[in-house]
Amino acid sequence: MWPFSRQQNVSRILPIVPTAPRRFPVWFPAVLVLVLIALDQWLKAWALAHLQLNAPAIPVIPGVLDWELTFNTGAAWSMFSGSAVPLALGRILVGLGILSYLLWKPQGRFLTVVLSMIAAGAIGNSIDGLQRGQVTDMIHSPLLSAVTEAINGTRFPIFNIADMCVVGGTILLLVASLLPERKREKAVPEA
């Protein structure tokens, strides 16, 4: 039997050095943003080619997910309706600002992914606002609509991948900010 535990032996040989958070390569945020924007734009093009405005919803996963084409000149729940171009300019500034920050000052992996999602969503919807004067939405959730109808009598908005990126990234960022920060425990050398 060893006089010390394995951890004690290792810590006597190798000092515990705090490590920086693991990071992606500096180009990763730009690639992730481009991939998410491409996916968003592809689905919007598909929806414009295959779905009809005011047509009945097409169930994908019955009761959970439907295809339903609509357009929005504002933000969620039609807030700021008729303001597509000013909203698009604001979104593109936010998206490019976040992406520039990530490229200029690399962050840990979690924050890089979350902020890249938000940037991609902002830029994806700004492309629609600048090109068409409206944002193309096509994803509807009957399940989420049932919840919002029970709470306040309104249907959950129809959304797109860009919206999912912004909302998902924001929720993840909020949850992470509420969790206690994990700190590495430093071993105290024994005398």
Swiss-Prot record:
This protein's record includes keyword Transmembrane helix: yes
Superkingdom assignment: Bacteria
Active site: D137, D163
A GO term for molecular function: endopeptidase activity
Subcellular location: Cell membrane
Keyword DNA repair found: no
Catalytic activity: Release of signal peptides from bacterial membrane prolipoproteins. Hydrolyzes -Xaa-Yaa-Zaa-|-(S,diacylglyceryl)Cys-, in which Xaa is hydrophobic (preferably Leu), and Yaa (Ala or Ser) and Zaa (Gly or Ala) have small, neutral side chains
InterPro entries the UniProt entry points to: Peptidase_A8
Membrane topology (UniProt): Multi-pass membrane protein
Pathway: Protein modification; lipoprotein biosynthesis (signal peptide cleavage)
Residues that span the membrane, as ranges: 26-46, 84-104, 110-130, 156-176
One GO CC term, this protein: plasma membrane
Its EC number(s): 3.4.23.36
UniProt keyword terms in alphabetical order: Aspartyl protease, Cell membrane, Hydrolase, Membrane, Protease, Transmembrane, Transmembrane helix
UniProt record, GO biological process: proteolysis
Leading EC class: hydrolase
Principal place of residence: membrane
Family classification: Belongs to the peptidase A8 family.
UniProt function note: This protein specifically catalyzes the removal of signal peptides from prolipoproteins.
Designated name of the protein: Lipoprotein signal peptidase
Species name: Deinococcus radiodurans (strain ATCC 13939 / DSM 20539 / JCM 16871 / CCUG 27074 / LMG 4051 / NBRC 15346 / NCIMB 9279 / VKM B-1422 / R1)
Gene: lspA
